[in-house]
Each structure stands twice: as structure tokens, then as C-alpha cells.
Amino acid sequence: MKINLSIMLRLAALVAATAILGGCVTRQPYDYTAFKEARPASILVLPPINNSPDVKATYSLMSQATLPLAESGYYVFPVTLVDETFKQNGLTTPNDIHGVPVNKLREIFGADAALYINIKEYGTKYIVISSETRVTAEARLVDLRTGKTLWAGAATASSAEGDSGGGGGLVGLLVKAAVRQIIETAVDQGHPIAGLTSNRLLSAAVPNGILHGPRSPRYQKEGASAK
């Protein structure tokens, strides 16, 4: 069977053009109108809803969500205080806490905004010839005075980032993946990965992230990406 060289060249050009166009797609700037109008100074981080099978996910991510927010210029209510206050009010599960009316949260804590986090992935998975620990989360920042969503975003981090795979053949890769899974599961590798996810999700330094708060020297000085 003869191969039509002209057709092959056209197909190759089409594939190359598609790849180039795909690489040139730019992320649309987030609309911060409501955020700028609200000007929140304090943030209440609610216990994240955990959709992963790992029971450690909720408090692992919650305990590491305060730092990027504080570094971005906000007062963040201490995790222990928040957890204990909810327990004293008979609320012990993230789902119940997320269902509390915003005006009630405002009344109890006096916070300007609340952060609702949903954990989509947390933990180590063994996939054929690889093993990785992945944490993926979504978040919404809600104005407790009006109930409006001020900002929303998502982020993920993985222990396999930058992993070239290495040599050793198929057997070597299988052994490496199995050993890696055992180690990562035993030492809860999900916790440091959750820290990376939190930074990517909640830092004002990332594209389309939250705006800097009033405690930051960059408050109300965001560039064009924040408009």
C-alpha cells in the first residue's frame, strides 16, 4: 500500500498547529469586582469536606490553609479555636458546618468571610507501573455579610511532579512503584503534598488567586490580572 506523502505532511502540520494553539491558550483573568467591594480583612476557614477515602484529609489540609492566607495579608481564625467553637455548638462534621447559614457564622465568629474547601483527592495510589500521592482541592471564599461568593479556585499537587521514571525495565518500575507506595502510605506523604496544594490554592501570589489582604503591603495594589 502506497502512502500519500502530501496527506501525511498535511496531517503532521495539523497536529503541530493544534499543539501550538493548545500551548498558547491563556487563562482568563478572574473577575474580582465583588471581592474588591467587600474588602474582607478576616477569614474563617471551615473544616474541609472530604471526598477522599483518607480520614486524615480534612484536618491535614485545614491545618495548612491558614499560613498562605495569613501571608497574603488576612487575619485567619486559629484552627483549634474554630474546631472547639463548632463542637460547643453541637457541630462535629464538615457537612453540617458547611450548612450553617452565613449570618449565623458571622454572629458566632464576627469574621468578614468564610472559606469553604472541598477535598477531591487525598492519598497514595498505585497505577500500573507508577505510584503517586495526590491532593486536589476546590475552595470558595464567601462574604458572611452578604452571602456573595467573592472568589473561587482549585489546585492540585502530586509527589510524581518532575518524576522522569528512570530505568530498570518493567520489573524495576513495578518494584519501585510498590516500594514508593508503601513508604508514602506509611509516613502519610499526603500531609506535605496537602501543604503544596494549600499554597497553590490560597496564596495571593498565584494567577487568579485571592487578592492581598489589608495586612499586606501589596493590599489594593494588584496589577491587571486582578481587575
Feature names for model-found ranges:
Residues 2-13:
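Bacterial N-terminal signal peptides that target proteins for export
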Residues 18, 37, 108-111:
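Alpha-helix termination/capping residues and helix-transition junctions
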Residues 19-23:
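C-terminal motif of bacterial Sec signal peptides marking the signal peptidase cleavage site
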Residues 24-41, 144-227:
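C-terminal/domain-edge helix-coil "capping" segments
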Residues 33-56:
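Post-signal peptide N-terminal segment of mature Sec-exported envelope proteins
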Residues 50-53, 82-86, 120-125, 156-160:
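Solvent-exposed loop/turn segments at secondary-structure junctions
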Residues 52-116, 148, 152, 177, ...:
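N-terminal segment of the mature soluble domain
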Residues 94-150, 160-172, 176, 215-227:
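Surface-exposed short loop/turn segments
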